[in-house]
Amino acid sequence: KLLMGTSGTVGVIRLLVLLCFFLSMVITNDVALITFVPLALIIVHKLPKELGNYWFLKIVAMQTIAANLGSMLTPIGNPQNLYLYARAGMSAAELIILMLPYSATSLILLLIWIQLAAAKAPHVCGSEKDKTLLGFSDRKELNMEYLAAYLILFTICLLTVARIIPYQIPLVLVLIYMLLRNRENISRVDYSLLATFIALFIFIGNLGRIPQFSSFLERIMAGRETLTAVLASQIMSNVPAALLLSGFTDNYRALIVGTNIGGLGTLIASMASLISFKYIAKENRNLRGKYLGIFTASNIIFMIFMLILYFFLR
């Protein structure tokens, strides 16, 4: 229904990118990408060939950056925010105010990027373009029981984030519901990605216990918490960076800014970016290198703008 309310290819591209940006604030960057990247790929395949080829890699890179940048505005948008927000004892309002300038600037940059890309897109006559998009009518009937149940469970999870109820309650409720009503989805979990996270967290935990490394980290972090977090995120991803660096400083506001900006840059800077990359690899393994080039270049540009804003706001 949302797609039917847009006009033309650029309108649909803009909508798909903005959905990732805004919904990542509520459903997390990972879930936003899992939801909307496959939808974007379906739509791109329905475009005329030349137009589809033009947007195929660009829209996924745009959605990935949008999800990572949109998610930085709220405590529940991404794991590092949730962890540092809890560790710092901040209120949700404090975190939102801290990250609002970065989020607002990111939105403006995304809209400019879409318009610049649209200006260089191959020209397709309006009637053919609109007909192609209007042909997207493969809709399934919405299961109201699932919708109601997941909304209730989601609300309970939000109450946990707000420190109103203990985390054990949503953990048990979600697990029971999934086992009783939606067991097949348990087998669809990307356990390899979870295993990667677990191994990375164990490695980071062990690294922080090495005396020589700890003293080195304390020296380089003093007064440079944000930049250290940005650089560390490029190597170990921003969530492990948040876990590691939080043990060596109590300047959690600087770490929140640093790990969110640090989600830009390399492919592993944010683990959510790997989700999009896996979709590209699944579609066409030969395009992995080209996508990585587009992704990295655009991420670096956005990171530069975010760092300029950071130095301006200091």
Residues of each region from the PLM?
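Short helix-coil transition sites and intra-membrane helix breaks within transmembrane domains
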Residues: 23-35, 70-78, 230-246, 262-271
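Membrane-interface alpha-helices at helix entry/exit sites of multi-pass transporters
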Residues: 10-15, 48-62, 90-100, 251-263, ...
